[in-house]
């Protein structure tokens, strides 16, 4: 992670199961962590727990900054922008970066809340329905809403983190590495987190069956549902 490259990362349990995921962006002498709004307090507390006595200051700046999304095409209009996942530029004081998970998600911009409307005007951006963004994310297969429902229920590698540039198998030790590496190296990946859509009705049962065989389990039941689906 540096001034021109942001990344996708996660926190796992010692067993390699999902806890949190977030984006990391270089900011002055520190870093921004961009995560789901509902997970801010829990992530802050978890990081504060890991800090121990290290000389690291962790701040919750969610009341000072806001994140907005823009299209890949709009991002590439900016001077110096490159069509590379995670590529980051700075427009005045605002960080703009192409989503490191999938370019199809477009770019994100971190804006000081007090200057939000001024920044959007100078960037020639206009507000749109936020559900359009989450619908796109759901179609691509990236869970960004109600991710607390995944905690301790699914391995990070089953969340497609390798495909989303969120796992580096050349990296040194990290919490959850042993099981993550074992699943990868021994080809033990037997299920994945996938988006599901209802033809009609509503989700009443967690279990998903195909021809009387259990093939998966619904983990996120809300507006943009996801399930852990087994390979057949």
Model region roles, listed by residue range:
Residues 15, 26-28, 51, 189, ...:
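A generic beta-sheet turn/junction motif
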Residues 8, 21, 86, 106, ...:
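Short, acidic/polar N-cap/turn motifs at the starts of alpha helices
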Residues 1-3, 70-75, 197-203:
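Short, surface-exposed ligand-recognition loops at beta-strand->loop->(often short) alpha-helix junctions
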Residues 2-5, 83-90, 201-207:
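Glycine-centered loop/turn motifs
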Residues 18, 157-167, 177, 181-232:
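Glycine-rich, small/acidic residue-mixed loop/short-helix segments
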Residues 1-21, 25-28:
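Acidic, proline/glycine-enriched N-terminal capping motif
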Residues 23-140, 210:
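Acidic, low-complexity central loop/insert segments
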Residues 102, 107-193:
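Anionic-ligand-binding alpha/beta catalytic cores of soluble enzymes and soluble regulatory domains
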């Amino acid at each position: 992670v540096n001034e021109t490259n942001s990344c996708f990362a996660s926190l796992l349990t010692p067993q390699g199961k999902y806890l949190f995921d977030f984006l990391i962006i270089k900011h002055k002498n520190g870093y921004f962590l961009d995560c789901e709004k509902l997970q801010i307090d829990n992530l802050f507390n978890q990081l504060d727990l890991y800090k121990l006595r290290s000389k690291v200051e962790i701040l919750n700046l969610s009341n000072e900054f806001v994140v907005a999304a823009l299209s890949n095409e709009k991002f590439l209009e900016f001077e110096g922008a490159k069509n590379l996942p995670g590529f980051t530029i700075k427009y005045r004081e605002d960080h703009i970066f192409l989503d490191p998970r999938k370019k199809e998600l477009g770019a994100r911009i971190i804006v000081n809340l007090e200057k939000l409307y001024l920044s959007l005007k100078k960037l020639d951006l206009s507000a749109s329905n936020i559900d359009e963004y989450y619908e796109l994310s759901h179609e691509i297969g990236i869970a960004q809403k109600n991710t607390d429902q995944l905690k301790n229920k699914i391995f990070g590698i089953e969340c497609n983190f390798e495909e989303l540039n969120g796992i580096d198998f050349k990296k040194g030790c990290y919490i959850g590495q042993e099981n993550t590496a074992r699943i990868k190296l021994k080809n033990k990946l037997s299920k994945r987190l996938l988006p599901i859509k209802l033809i009609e009705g509503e989700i009443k049962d967690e279990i998903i069956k195909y021809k009387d065989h259990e093939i998966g389990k619904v983990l996120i039941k809300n507006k943009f549902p996801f399930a852990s689906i087994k390979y057949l």
